[in-house]
Design a protein with these regions (language model features):
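A structural signal for multi-pass alpha-helical bundles of membrane permease subunits
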Residues: 1-2, 6-262, 268-269
Length: 270
């Protein structure tokens, strides 16, 4: 207690009144203003924020609709071995996600299996740097996330599809409805009604999806334009991975960290 009192009123701390100065919203203005002391901070934040929202959109809705499509195809009348197809897809869920992501990341390395096969077949003359190019890296993380997420969405969609009354489909078929009309008027509205809250939480979860981005890209590709006093960022960084790199980097500049943290929605993700 004596140490706390002494530290609070020593030469570095002139009482409680001078511990800090209120600055209002000036810190947020610095984050979005190009005329701030760290001018590149606002540009870097804007680029990472736009990619984060783009990633969250594609990661959420590609998995949702493709998982639903796979469930519809497996549940379709005339499809044999339905349990087998579901079992094969579920195997990807049984393997821990971080193992799958690290393994697939190595497949697309410069010396990985994918490049080795393309070189051997003569499709390319030199190895493709998948993770060093912004476009290819962003496409890959979205596609690999689809591969990881479709089985789970397939199971969720299967359970919901089995609860849709078949009388609705039979009645609409008698009225002359096409397969597409049945999907748009019966299947999709029912799915959205049941999974609406799930879609919202999934979107927020993908904004904070640290594992997929960090384990796949491992801090690639670097960009000379995304450099701030808090450290450099990559063109595949989400806000959450950028925050992690800033706090664990050599500079440990917590100013952009506090800004970024306040912009992140809170959601638990396994």
């Amino acid at each position: 207690r004596q140490m706390c009192i002494r530290d609070s009123y020593d030469g570095a701390h002139d009482g409680y009144s001078n511990l800090f100065t209120w600055v209002g919203l000036s810190n947020f203005n610095e984050l979005i203003s190009s005329s701030s002391a760290d001018a590149n901070l606002s540009y870097t934040f804007g680029e990472i924020l736009s990619w984060t929202l783009m990633w969250a959109f594609f990661a959420t809705f590609t998995n949702y609709f493709l998982g639903m499509l796979v469930a519809i195809l497996i549940n379709k009348k005339g499809i044999h071995f339905k349990k087998l197809w579901r079992g094969i897809l579920v195997l990807t869920i049984a393997v821990p996600q971080f193992i799958s992501l690290l393994y697939v990341s190595k497949l697309f390395d410069t010396n990985g299996v994918v490049n080795a096969m393309l070189l051997k077949l003569g499709f390319i003359d030199q190895a493709i740097r998948f993770w060093e190019n912004t476009t290819s890296a962003r496409i890959l993380v979205i596609v690999i996330n689809i591969w990881v997420g479709i089985p789970y969405l397939m199971l969720v969609s299967t359970g919901i599809l089995m609860n849709i009354p078949q009388d609705l489909y039979e009645s609409s078929k008698i009225d002359g409805a096409s397969v597409w009309q049945q999907y748009m008027k019966i299947t999709l509205p029912y799915m959205l009604f049941v999974t609406g809250p799930y879609l919202l939480t999934q979107f927020i979860g993908n904004i904070n999806n640290f594992n997929v981005i960090y384990l796949l890209t491992s801090g690639r590709p670097a960009s000379p334009d995304l450099v701030t006093s808090g450290g450099s960022a990559t063109t595949t960084d989400l806000l959450i991975t950028w925050l992690f790199n800033i706090t664990t980097g050599a500079t440990s500049n917590y100013k952009p960290v506090s800004y970024t943290h306040l912009t992140l929605p809170t959601n638990s993700r396994v």
